[in-house]
Amino acid sequence: MDGYVSHYTNKLDAKGRVSIPAPFRAVLVRDGFDGLYVHPSIDQEALDCGGHALLREIDGLLSGLSPYSEERDLFSTALIGTSEILKVDSEGRTILTETLKSYAGITGEVTFVGHGHKFQIWEPGRFRAHLEEARNRVRDLRRQLSARHAAPDAPPLRSHGARE
């Protein structure tokens, strides 16, 4: 996989800088993005981050919506209007703004979590709780998939909290 994989926890230094994990920096470099694109996650109290691949995904989503539609305006506001482009120094560090830290509840440490085309930045305790919930939900979904394979005419899967 050429994307962001695994998770890492790093501390903010006395100047508020945090080191982006080397494997994540390598993906940003391959992507050709100079800096770090960051916006508050729509679904979690975390930050969505990446480079050109993330921006292309957002552009693709927006281009599928009618210009001047309420839906497009809402997505644009949430994904572009609240975003920031952060600088990354020569040692691979960046400084999260107070707005971003406040949204994600970040104080002294952050956990970087790979999602393939993007990564997220979490407050470590919030990430542990999210990971536990995700594992529980995946176990439930796996059981549903197993049951579905046993009964191929079953209705489509619907995960807890799924949107229409």
Curated annotation (Swiss-Prot):
It is found in: Cytoplasm, Nucleoid. It comes from the Bacteria. GO terms for molecular function: DNA-binding transcription factor activity; transcription cis-regulatory region binding. The keyword Cytoplasm applies. Residues 144-164 are annotated as: Disordered. Gene3D superfamilies: Transcriptional regulator MraZ domain. Its main location: cytoplasm. CDD domains: MraZ_C, MraZ_N. PROSITE patterns: SPOVT_ABRB. This is Transcriptional regulator MraZ. It comes from Methylocella silvestris (strain DSM 15510 / CIP 108128 / LMG 27833 / NCIMB 13906 / BL2). The gene is mraZ.
